[in-house]
């Protein structure tokens, strides 16, 4: 219980933990990692090759994973165990999918994720930048597994967690999935404004959600 209380106090203070402070970086720095992989692929001529060896496939997959977690809001490890389908009829409603309808039309279907009970099935359209990178990957990954481990089998969530750390090694920081999400949220949310909203909601004896409903432009 005491540990729980300490954790909640830490979260509510909005202060970084010691470990977070040590490894904290910026979105700009994370984007640089993605651009680093792109440059590596271009300089090695990998993007123009028809067939890639294992090392080249791994470099391309690192580029893909860096893009998955920087070109859109970073989800948890739900790309682990993800399958590739081309038709919604193939969605059995149990696992997560990359729905590949065509070269310019793709989406992620999430059936299995942490908040599935309260949120239900989610479909997220893929933006054009990420779509281009996925196309490069699918040109060489002909399996129905979205991400691959070192044995060319489906990458599970545990393996993806370790892989993310390897992908972001160029930052010289220990970048975990959790830290990635904290960095992204911190740069996209006005914390002072949110604190002000919460204080006002407390003083008016209603929830912050209700307050948003009440607010008019």
Give the location of each predicted region.
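Short, basic/aromatic-rich helical patch in the C-terminal catalytic core of site-specific tyrosine
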Residues: 65, 80, 177-192, 200-201
């Amino acid at each position: 219980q005491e540990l729980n209380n300490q954790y909640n106090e830490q979260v509510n203070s909005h202060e970084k933990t010691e470990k977070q402070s040590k490894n904290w970086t910026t979105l700009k720095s994370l984007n640089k990692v993605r651009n680093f992989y792109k440059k590596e692929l271009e300089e090695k001529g990998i993007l123009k090759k028809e067939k890639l060896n294992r090392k080249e496939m791994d470099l391309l997959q690192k580029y893909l994973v860096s893009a998955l977690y920087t070109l859109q809001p970073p989800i948890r490890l739900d790309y682990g165990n993800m399958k590739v389908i081309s038709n919604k009829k193939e969605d059995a409603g149990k696992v997560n999918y990359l729905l590949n309808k065509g070269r310019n039309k793709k989406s992620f279907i999430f059936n299995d994720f942490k908040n599935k009970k309260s949120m239900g099935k989610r479909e997220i359209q893929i933006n054009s930048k990420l779509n281009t990178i996925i196309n490069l990957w699918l040109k060489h990954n002909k399996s129905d597994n979205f991400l691959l481990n070192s044995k060319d089998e489906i990458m599970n969530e545990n393996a993806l967690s370790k892989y993310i750390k390897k992908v972001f090694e160029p930052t010289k920081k220990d970048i975990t999935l959790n830290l990635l999400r904290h960095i992204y949220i911190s740069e996209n949310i006005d914390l002072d404004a949110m604190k002000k909203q919460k204080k006002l909601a407390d003083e008016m004896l209603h929830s912050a959600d209700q307050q948003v409903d009440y607010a008019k432009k």
